[in-house]
């Protein structure tokens, strides 16, 4: 027996109270969400002011009959039985009055609700399913949702209307069903027919033609971008006979197709399991089918649950911050320029002073040489050209010395770890400075060679004998007659060979070649677009430095050895760099490692677990170099360490991107086998025979080396962002944070047990982090297998929820899109029941599509005012600009200070 209250007049409202009031009543029903305007039974806001009287109706629902048990007005007074009510008791439900119309709607909804909950009383055996849908129906519907999402509203209707007028010019304004796809601009004729039938069924149109008004109505539904409308269209196309029922096979098909549309292969493989989960939820009595409306209810509930609710105070704060973050435009160009310059200097002062100092030193050297040669005896003949050439040469000598310093990684790591220079020197930009100096070398070499070949040498060749006489001490008694005189000399040969070798090395070091982006190169030349080509051609600089010393010694215009300063510039940097390379070779041979475990994961990722050498101390966020002689005895490649400093092993996760990593995966795949059931990875191999296992290739390591992410401990709040394989340094940091917090808690417990007081917090305390936000964005679902065990471990150990983890799978359509609605609903059901996310396979709930980074920064700024937040990013360069800009924007406009750091290898 069910009781329903509604208003007698006005638009009806329902405060449905479905309770167990008797042995014949149905079970407790779940709340149902419907958007206003839905033709089905609608539960509206019960808080709305009501002026019309209430009617308290108690009805008995059994099978297909509805009988009224009692009917009372508000206050308890009975209502006289009317002819309409008598008809209602007889189950005729003739719609003669407004009240009866409402009662009929209520009874219809109650029948629907009881069918959802499994029926009442003596349940009628289920009717044979009348499902004549083909397996292509759901598939076509999913494709249709893509089309529906791409329509362009009013602008599209004008084109549709124009085609309608052209097509129906000979049919009297009636559009044939077969011409529907052509009229709305749909290329798939079969899908257009399916869509036409679905839209026609919704409106009880049985003919094969429609007029212009009906077409516009069809178009409005197609163009309606609301979640409910697109979902309704999807279901209408699946439910061909409009009986509103789905069997388990059909649920399985929809899950499989939804997973396929979102590139979720794991869910596709487990479609049977998830279909059974939905049937268990919506068909607890094993009738054999579920109502389409019940599935829609779950989908809508899942969609509404994805919306984060906020308190009024938080909403106001969010609104105020949004207003403050709106860009402001100053009409005064000088003020705009000053404001931009001030912000730039505040955020980049470390880089600025280094670059300015570099320019000043080069300017001083250039000016010094220019003045020196302007006073020399060669100036009257060779003019300012020789001054320009010698000034540029001096800057080249300086830069050829400086360019080695940023790649002395051991020295830089020692300086940033053991000294306070990191406060003023941007060690994180070492590779960027290396590239800037390379540009300076290119400019200097161009000026030097150009001034000689195009200016002062021609002037020397065409000088008169009288003018040449003072230059005999430099070029000999016989005046040069051609360029060959200069080319055939030591200076000429060494100079041309250096330029050629540097041109090769610089070209292959550009991102297009180094990262293999030039796919259009012919077969033999494709090997030039690789990291290997960059690595080996960079060693040509060994020859370049030897030639540079020779070129600087055999000078035309300088005879005294102490004035030949090239070797003076180079001696310290070259010796320092040579020592670095010797240390790498020596250290890697001493610190022997054995391979404990190897796994090959989806997405071409190779995970290697190594034994940890004694005295190998590192910080989370640092990286090390790896060498495998079976691939190449000379190549060393940097990879972030994914294990935590407290672990007794070292681990790296290597993404197969180039020729070296591809060969490395091939070598290890030969000793790997498919894992047992329940173990992640496509291939695995564990060390079972100790250090003498001959199956694994020998691996050498060198490191650790400093990286920007290692400074995360300096911040109380950190935002960690990893894009794809860029999550590797962040994984180590996340583990380290948990370990440090656990250690602090254990130390506090020990002090409490011993009765000692808590030590005063030091300003130099190494670990300050109290809150961490980790965002991992990846394109493929299989990527979550890389760190599945680590994510589960962190989620389990982080009892105080210090770390907030967010996984984003960009292959899935964003939350709120009908194409991902079923996936989101499955995610909610499975996580509630099993505590596992169906997308990532971890305890961490995944999100769909890309994060809204502005909202991420905004939420952190609201939660942590007057706090300095460290933002650490590792991944593709495309996102760097956005994250850095947001960090600057929120720093300048809120009380939260965001300090952005990017990993560089």
Swiss-Prot record:
Residues 390-549 form the Ferric oxidoreductase domain. Residues 39-49 have a biased composition (Polar residues). The keyword Oxidoreductase applies. One of its GO terms (cellular component) is membrane. Residues 1-351, 458-492, 558-565, 735-905 are cytoplasmic. Its main location: membrane. Coiled coil: none annotated. It comes from the Eukaryota. Keywords: Calcium, FAD, Flavoprotein, Membrane, Metal-binding, NADP, Oxidoreductase, Peroxidase, Phosphoprotein, Repeat, Transmembrane, Transmembrane helix. Induction: By potassium starvation. In roots, expressed in the epidermis in the proximal regions of the meristem, in the elongation zone, in the differentiation zone and in elongating root hairs. Residues 226-261, 270-305 form the EF-hand domain. Ca(2+) binds at residues 239, 241, 243, 245, 250. Residues 373-436, 514-536, 584-713 are extracellular. The chain crosses the membrane at residues 352-372, 437-457, 493-513, 537-557, 566-583, 714-734. Residues 587-711 form the FAD-binding FR-type domain. Pfam families: FAD_binding_8, Ferric_reduct, NAD_binding_6, NADPH_Ox. The modification Phosphoserine is found at residues 25, 318, 322. Disruption phenotype: Plants have short root hairs and stunted roots. Its EC number is 1.11.1.-, 1.6.3.-. Residues 168-178 are annotated as: EF-hand-like 1. It is a multi-pass membrane protein. Belongs to the RBOH (TC 5.B.1.3) family. Calcium-dependent NADPH oxidase that generates superoxide. Required for H(2)O(2) production in response to K(+) deficiency and for the generation of reactive oxygen species (ROS) that regulate cell expansion through the activation of Ca(2+) channels. This is Respiratory burst oxidase homolog protein C. It comes from Arabidopsis thaliana (Mouse-ear cress).
